[in-house]
Regions:
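Bacterial N-terminal signal peptides that target proteins for export
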Residues: 1-3
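C-terminal motif of bacterial Sec signal peptides marking the signal peptidase cleavage site
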Residues: 12-15
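Mature extracytoplasmic enzyme cores
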Residues: 20, 25-34, 42, 57-68, ...
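Acidic-and-aromatic substrate-binding clefts and catalytic sites of carbohydrate-active enzymes
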Residues: 48-57, 79-92, 320-324
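Second-shell loop/turn segments in exported
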Residues: 48-51, 83-86, 200-205, 290-292
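Hydrophobic residues within beta-strands of alpha/beta enzymes
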Residues: 73-75, 236
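Aromatic-lined carbohydrate-recognition surfaces of secreted/lumenal glycan-active proteins
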Residues: 108-116, 232-240, 292-324
Length: 324
């Protein structure tokens, strides 16, 4: 049941501090480091926790890592876990692993999620904060030459007038049964799954979601191992946080407001330019992508940066690639 992830994470010394000894650039010092590297120069594999986690299994895995010449480990919750994630038992076992690792000269890194992608805290974020997932995350386009009889399911309706589009969402009665080029946008939602604790993944662009995630995820670690933050608990690994669309254009509730504030014009009547190469589509697409990126930086990366700086923790991991 217990496995070590195939990919080994090699850690360098860039930005590392805490309990690590200062090095010099003398040849003799470097030669000694190559002969017997300190922990920050050694590999640190995933220490996968699944099934029933016990102190005996922790001892075995840490011994295997030490015998293999590793410098630390990332404790990684994975599918199949019986021990409840973020329970009192979970944190007690984590404390045991930290103490055992320190005794053996192995750094322990926190993995910030129950599997991946980071952000939902094993289902606790959507459970505590419904607005993190239930407002829609995408806009799916349907084009038609005649408005349907029922339009309630559409969030935005545009009509092409010459080389521009007019937002007629609140004036549909004037256009019923009138032929034209209509662009109908419907909200799409991230799908619910057992993987996310019966909920869905969350919208990391919604204000407060990352702060809720950090609070729910880290408060248990703060209670049990904070005294080792920046010491034997070296940092945090994040895994594939992302802002992918569940269908259509990526959207979030205050996208249009943030876009206008940043670029000085309204994105809504220009949504077709995100799909069609017409008009000033290159500028609009650039500004749209830049807005999403900046929202991700401001609402995901910066809260984590502040937390890690405040708590003397390093930050590593990898983001999910986007097909933009």
């Amino acid at each position: 049941i217990y496995t070590v992830a195939g990919g080994i994470l090699s850690l360098g010394t860039t930005g590392c501090s805490g309990n690590k000894a200062e090095t010099t650039d003398s040849f003799s010092t470097l030669e000694a480091q190559f002969s017997n590297p300190s922990s920050e120069y050694r590999t640190a594999p995933f220490m996968v926790w699944n099934g029933k986690v016990t102190e005996i299994e922790i001892d075995r895995m840490l011994k295997d890592f030490k015998d293999a010449g590793c410098g630390g480990a990332f404790i990684h919750p994975r599918p199949g876990m019986i021990t409840e994630y973020m329970s009192d038992e979970w944190y007690s076992l984590y404390r045991y692993a930290v103490d055992k690792g320190k005794e053996m000269g192995l750094d322990i890194w926190i993995y910030d999620e129950n599997s991946y992608p980071s952000g939902f805290a094993g289902g606790h974020v959507p459970e505590d904060m419904p607005e993190s997932y239930n407002q829609g995350q995408g806009l799916e386009l349907t084009k038609t030459d005649l408005l349907p009889d029922k339009t309630d399911e559409y969030f935005i309706i545009l009509k092409k007038e010459g080389d521009k589009w007019a937002d007629i969402t609140n004036a549909l009665s004037q256009h019923k049964k009138a032929k034209g080029e209509y662009y109908l946008y419907k909200k799409t939602y991230l799908g619910k799954s057992d993987w996310y604790g019966g909920y869905s993944y969350v919208d990391l662009l919604v204000p407060g979601v990352t702060e809720k995630f950090i609070d729910l995820t880290m408060k248990g670690y703060e209670k049990t191992i904070k005294d080792e933050f920046g010491k034997s608990v070296f940092g945090i690994f994040t895994d594939e946080p992302n802002i992918s669309s569940p269908g259509g254009l990526r959207w979030t509730p205050d996208l249009f407001e943030v876009f206008r504030k940043q670029w000085g014009y309204d994105l809504k009547p220009l949504l077709p330019l995100l799909d069609e190469e017409t008009g000033n589509w290159k500028q609009v697409r650039h500004n749209y992508m830049e807005t999403l990126l900046q929202m991700f930086v401001d609402r995901w990366s910066k809260p984590w940066h502040h937390y890690c700086e405040t708590n003397n923790l390093k930050w590593t991991g990898h983001y999910w690639e986007h097909g933009w």
